[in-house]
Regions:
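Ribonuclease/tRNase effector modules and their secretory precursors
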Residues: 1-71
Length: 71
């Protein structure tokens, strides 16, 4: 997955966003559709109010896809 794959997820109006409390820094996880219609899970953090640093991007699991589609 590339940065280009992850960017559309942030514009998906149906995206699900949760805070990830398992790390020392404030991290977030967003699940949404990319430009190809794939459901991706993107972990990220804010470096300042206008800068998002993507930590990882991956395809959603079967259970995660189901969760996204149910909302």
């Amino acid at each position: 997955m590339s940065l280009a794959d992850a960017e559309p997820v942030f514009y998906d109006e149906a995206a699900l966003t949760l805070q990830d409390h398992d790390h020392g820094e404030e991290r977030w996880v967003i699940m949404g559709a990319d430009a190809k219609g794939r459901i991706l899970v993107v972990a990220y953090t804010y470096r300042d109010p206008n800068f998002v640093r993507i930590i990882s991007t991956r395809l959603a699991s079967k259970n995660e896809r189901r969760q996204y589609l149910e909302v």
